[in-house]
Structures are given as structure tokens and as C-alpha cells.
A protein has these predicted regions:
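Short, leucine-enriched amphipathic alpha-helices that occur as contiguous helical runs
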Residues: 28, 32-40
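Hydrophobic/aromatic residues within well-ordered alpha-helical segments
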Residues: 31, 74, 81, 85, ...
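C-terminal peripheral helix-coil segments that are non-catalytic and often amphipathic
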Residues: 1-19, 112-115, 119, 147, ...
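Amphipathic alpha-helical segments used for helix-helix packing
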Residues: 118-140, 188-196
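Helix-turn-helix
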Residues: 34, 42-76, 80
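Amphipathic alpha-helical linker/stalk segments
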Residues: 81-108, 153-159
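Hydrophobic alpha-helical connector segments
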Residues: 94-123, 163, 171-178
Length: 217
């Protein structure tokens, strides 16, 4: 029987089983991660201006159109990579609280930061490159969330000092010093290896470096 004039046929959306949906979500996440990893590798070597969307898509083994489905532009991809990096870096600092032992807390933080320099040197170099260039794409993140966090954790350090648990020191300069020293082992790894013939990937050198930084700080 033919359908009457004007009758419409509604096509229902395809429904996936929970297992299939979970598998699809995992595949999408893996592809997004692969794109971000490829972008990190290229951005940390060539910068934003020296990297093309085509290069990232080729390294990630996805089509350009597929990449632009996840990230609307090269700048958007870059910002996603570097803000994710900033989130990872700041997570250990967020755990600081006045109830903790300051020496133990700072020693653990130094270790985590040095491990990040050892395990993720490309991330450190990318962040360094961005800041040296004036942080044109990251300045809002530095002026708001980062500043808010540093103000809060500076207050914790001041509480430690006032309780007599830590020698008087400017909290901001203390945090900056930890960042500068630990990230040096990623950003200047070539110089360190040229002078010492080692880097922090060497377990013994890592432990020696960690011990000395903790003592200095």
C-alpha cells in the first residue's frame, strides 16, 4: 500500500548497546590522545608557527578532517595541549594544606616535579617555549587560575612559617625556585649531559640530583 501524500517517515537514531557505546567512547578518547601526543611532539620541537595541521595529522595517523573534528584549529589544539600540561603540573601543588608537615610536603613535591622533568621533557620544553614568547595563547590561564592557586598555596606556606615549622621565606619565590630548578633538568638536558655525561634518566644521577635539590631548598 502506498503512503498517503504528506505523510512523513521519521528515522530513529541508531541506539548502541552499553558495551558498544563504551567501546566507541574508548576509541574516540584514544584517537584524541594520539592527536594530542603527536601535537606535543611537534610543537615542542618546532613551535606553533613551525607546525602544520597536516604534520600533526600525519604523525597521529588520522586524516586532516578527522583532526579538525576534534580540534577546530591548530591554535585550539595547541591550547588544549598546553592547558592539559598545566593542569597535570599543578595537581601536586593543589594538595598542599596547613595540616601537613612542610618539610615532607615540599620534599615530596620536589620529587614529583623532578620525576615530571625526567618522564615528560617535551611538555616542559613546550611550556618554556610558550612563556619565553610571552605566553600569547596562555596568558589568561596564567593570570587567573594559576595566580588563584599560587595565592592559596602561598597562604598555606605562610601558616607553616607562622607556626614555626618553616624558616621565613617568600612563598612565591620558594615555589618559583622549585619550578626553576626541577624544570632545568628537562629544558637544559643537553647542557647537563654535556657537562656530567649523565641525565635524570640515570637512576643514580636522579637520586643524587633529588637529594641535592631537597637539601638546597
Amino acid at each position: 500500500m502506498s503512503k498517503s501524500e504528506g505523510q512523513t517517515i521519521t528515522k530513529s537514531a541508531r541506539a548502541f548497546s552499553p558495551t558498544t557505546q563504551k567501546r566507541r567512547e574508548k576509541a574516540l578518547l584514544e584517537k584524541r590522545t594520539r592527536i594530542m601526543d603527536a601535537a606535543l611532539s611537534l610543537f615542542s620541537k618546532n613551535g606553533v608557527s613551525g607546525t602544520t595541521v597536516e604534520q600533526v595529522s600525519e604523525l597521529a595517523n588520522v586524516s586532516k578532517s578527522n583532526l579538525l573534528y576534534y580540534f577546530k584549529s591548530k591554535e585550539g589544539l595547541y591550547l588544549s595541549v598546553i592547558t592539559h600540561l598545566l593542569d597535570v603540573w599543578l595537581t601536586p601543588l593543589q594538595s598542599f594544606s596547613a595540616e601537613q608537615d612542610p618539610i615532607e610536603t615540599l620534599s615530596d613535591y620536589i620529587k614529583v616535579k623532578l620525576e615530571m622533568s625526567r618522564d615528560n621533557p617535551a611538555e616542559s620544553k613546550l611550556f618554556c617555549m610558550e612563556v619565553v614568547q610571552g605566553a600569547p595563547l596562555l596568558i589568561k590561564e596564567l593570570e587567573t587560575p594559576l595566580k588563584t592557586l599560587l595565592d592559596a598555596k602561598s597562604a598555606v606556606i605562610i601558616e607553616w612559617i607562622e607556626a614555626g615549622k618553616l624558616k621565613p621565606v617568600d612563598p612565591i619565590h620558594l615555589i618559583f625556585s622549585i619550578w626553576a630548578i626541577t624544570q632545568h633538568y628537562a629544558d637544559f638536558s643537553v647542557q647537563i649531559k654535556a657537562v656530567t655525561a649523565k641525565d635524570v634518566s640515570d637512576p643514580a644521577f636522579f637520586e643524587s640530583t633529588l637529594s641535592n635539590i631537597q637539601h638546597i631548598i
